[in-house]
Amino acid sequence: MMNSKKQDAFQRLIGALKVLPNVGPKSAQRMAYHLLQQKRKEAEELVDALQTALRQVRHCARCNTFCEGGLCDICADETRDGRRLMVVHMPADVSNIEAANCHDGLYFVLMGQINTALGMDVSAIALDRLAQRLDGGEIEEIIIATAFTAEGNATAYVLSEFFKNLPYKVSRLSQGIPLGGELEYVDAGTLAQAVYERRLIKEGGA
């Protein structure tokens, strides 16, 4: 049986692992046992990688995704079409859309979505940084690329209202994406079709 100090350290590890998505107490406990019993070297590498990421990874000054410099590779790429800005929930969405090869414009990453059940309101979606991103640019069309979930739809509605009186054409991905589907789990073909067949919300001009 663990003494109290070791028990405290073990419980602290479990508590830390529980912050990961979809990891409950039992899953966290299994992971903790696995790391301590069978994967100590890998656990040390994990700690080192996490500490390095915490020191070096920042938000892109332009699109708000994660990067290690001032600008991410996409924002720094002068060949991208700066007239079209796609607004997504998280960095994984950018990766998936890039893999589908269906958007050659730029992105803005909200780093959150509205979830009233969890107390996540408009402050969760970085509208202030989005407003800064729009200043002085060449943007003509904004593509809302949130998921067709309750949270994604709520976020899309708030974004539509935010853009309503601004001089941009606004569209949203078509509902070829399954209802309740997160972009993270949508195959490349379906995602590309949703981009190409996106639904117009408003024409350009205030």
UniProtKB/Swiss-Prot annotation:
Toprim domain ranges (all copies): 83-178
One annotated GO molecular function: zinc ion binding
Gene3D superfamilies assigned: 3.40.1360.10, RecR Domain 1
C4-type Zn finger ranges: 60-75
Metal-binding recorded as keyword: yes
GO biological process: DNA recombination; DNA repair
InterPro entries per the UniProt record, alphabetical: DNA_Rcmb_RecR, Rcmb_RecR, Rcmb_RecR_Znf, TOPRIM_dom, TOPRIM_RecR
Record key words, sorted: DNA damage, DNA recombination, DNA repair, Metal-binding, Zinc, Zinc-finger
Entry similarity comment: Belongs to the RecR family.
NCBIfam families documented for this protein: recR
The protein's name: Recombination protein RecR
The organism of origin for this protein: Neisseria gonorrhoeae (strain NCCP11945)
